[in-house]
Amino acid sequence: MSTARIHHRVGIILLLAWLIPSIACNFPTRSRQIREISEASLRQTLTALPNASPVEETPAPDATETPFSPAATESPATTPENSAPGSQPTSPPGSSSLFFIYSAQPGDTLAAIADRFGVAPEQITSSDYLPDAGLLPAGQILTIPNVVGETLYPGALLPDSEVIYSPSTVDFHTYDYIYGASGFLISFGELVDGEWTSGADILQRVAVETSINPRLLLALLEYRSRWVLGQPADPSYISYPLGFNVPGERGLYKEMYIAAKLITMGYYGWRSGTLTDITFPDGIKIRLSPELNAGSVALQYLFSRLYPQPGWYDALYGNNSFLTLHTQMFGDPWGRAAGVEPLFPLGLAQPAIELPFLPGESWSYSGGPHLAWTSGSPRGAIDFSPATGGPTCSVSQAWVTASAPGLVVRSSNNVVVIDLDGDGFEQTGWTLVYLHVADYERIPAGVWVNTDDPLGHPSCERGNSTGTHVHMARKYNGEWLDADGPLPFVLSGWLVQKGARNYEGYLIQGNERITANPGGSRISIIVR
């Protein structure tokens, strides 16, 4: 039996793990028909995906208006030519045999940098003050011992703002682009949550819910199956347009969600310092260059789940690479990034945020920090359950209330999003995301709310919930934020602190401590 067929059969066996329903509570799912896939299962499963190649791309027209932006100058993603994959290790710019001279990037923390470079935080020095906690100023110069040696592929691929649903998407209209492109996607539709949904609606929904840049998702779909600018070359691309080929997980919506999860894993794994290498389907492992940005690592990680190393190299660094197509479709990503980055400005701090229920009410802190949205996202969400009795999983008569003033920019699929800067864009500034808000009496989009205004009722609607509650998370400029990270989550003066595992944690205020407990015990009750 050929090696490729062995890889394929092993992949199918591992992929069956996705058919086992998750027992985790309070976890957002993609739809009622889709089982949630754990991060561990996703990592294990996708290492065994069969080898795949993109179809021949349809050249993007050279039009100068929507949907095609004129290609700009080459970005820093330009890579060495005529080099075999893995044959030319390169020391990152600014490094020597003994030390790296590293310029801090937006979103960097001392702890994450130390993990990426494989050193202890105290081994990193700078002529400027280095805080143990909090965000480092972008551009601060650090001297770091070189313990990783030479690394492969240090060149940046995409800026962070082109990977997440960031301010760079404010002037991008997904629907206009898709309909202007006149490819297969324009006529495609499928059932999602029991409702017929167009391909354009699917792309936009995945982008908004997972906070992944729609340009990236569209370019990926075109690169893998030619859906956006042309027609699929093979019938298999209809059922599995990205080629993940997970049994029972067919269709555009499910495949795009898998891709979004993988992008999320790479992006936030690098951001936190927990991801330092990638492993290909054939078992080859490479150390990631520690000077890369989160967006570039997200792309490297995603494509390592789709290709063995030679194919991965061609897809990211070859003459007809994914990045070449991305630029043909949307213009220079680095030029756009220059207009919106850094995503984390100097001195950024969370605005005043209140607990999501009315003053005087008693609720249970039923879930400590856990995944903000999906596998790979930071532990940015916390849960609150009304202490009003009633059936375990029902729509409560209690109200979820606005934790800060702002504009409701999204109210659908049991999610309410408040835009705190009021500009009407979820991808800019501070936003608060509430999940499991019942359909009944849920506030519509487009309404301005003040602190304590009612948003809707907590419920079990959407997700694998085992009890009535509201799930609450934050984003800034489209990036999910860790609840116990460099931008602390503080509600009504209570500081969120994570525990050892998902859903474990505390609320701290002075000498008081509330312990998260899904069962709603006395130690989890909090009164606002």
Q: Which residues does each PLM region occupy?
A:
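Short glycine/threonine/proline-enriched tight-turn/helix- or strand-capping micro-motif at secondary-structure
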Residues: P345-L348, A352, W363-S403, Y434
